[in-house]
Amino acid sequence: AFNGILFMTSKNPFNSGGVSVYGKTGITSSKDAGDNNFVDAGIRMAHKFSEKFAAKASFSFLKGTEWYATDYRDYNHAAEKAGEATIINAETGQTSFERLNIYGDEVKLSETPFGNLQGVAGYLASIGQIPAALVPLFPTDNVSRTGYKERDLTDYEANSAKVDVALHYKPFEDDLEIIYNAKFGQGNTIYQGANRYSIKNFFMQQHKIEVRNDDFFVRAYMTDEDAGDSYDMRFAGINLNKANASEWFGTYAGAYATGLGQVLGGGGNPTDPAVQSQLHANARQYADATVTLKPGTSKF
């Protein structure tokens, strides 16, 4: 139980018959998601057919829009040895980051055999892709992939449909009762756990057989669930960027080398932090435009 256990006792169709309905509607409003409709409706039907048999069925439907996760500040891991990482604003010109609600920027050069950008440059020079004379001019910066915003990996639409059917039988028309109960649920939402999960086409069913009277009860349950098309959004972003990481880092370093040549040709200083920051920005832009899979495209 993630948030505790809730005990519920439903109405018995022998005692509570008829039809009841409910409906709720409203609007959820937020800066990022705007105004969105919310609907929650349901119906319950129950009937006592005889002193021995009664049945009930209920159906409910909910539809709304999840809150958007748009805090893109950066994790600061400097204090990890003392405890949890803190959250800071990303710095201008930063080349390696791990931002909140952006997935895939965990893929970094520091986790590859190259180690840093100069390591990639050395490899490209060894296979004749860039001039060897440029390698010492590459900074030893760690570079991370450009991640995907959470809103690019999910649609934030939430809905659920639930069905509950119960058959009640009293063989001796006394307090001994045999109950068969079936529950079915399907839905889409976002689940927050260790990571953020996009729950898509989730389906769950539970079946119960119960024998009871005023002095005892015996229950047997069967529960089955299918995650459908659900996925961990953090690892979805990571795996998308891992799939073509070598190509992206190579393209990045190649674009940086092109920029270095232009700076040297114009008499500039390639070790100037402002120049390096611009070279990094141009290299990232080119690598993203050339290699990174774009949300909304067929390849993505």
Please annotate each region the language model reported.
Residues F2-T25, V39-M45:
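N-terminal periplasmic accessory domains that precede
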Residues G4, A161-V163, Q205:
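Short beta-strand or tight-loop elements
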Residues T9-K11, A46-F49, S60, H168-F172, ...:
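Structural signature of outer-membrane beta-barrel channels/translocons
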Residues N12-F14, I27, K63, D224:
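Active-site/binding-pocket entry motifs
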Residues N15-V19, E51-A55, D174-I178, Q205-H207, ...:
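Outer-envelope beta-barrel architecture signal
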Residues Y22-K200:
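Periplasmic-side early beta-strands and strand-to-turn transitions of outer-membrane beta-barrels
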Residues G64-Y68, E177-R212, F216-V263, N269, ...:
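Flexible loop and strand-edge segments within Gram-negative outer membrane beta-barrel domains
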Residues N89-R99, A243-K299:
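Non-catalytic, alpha-helical, charged scaffold/linker segments
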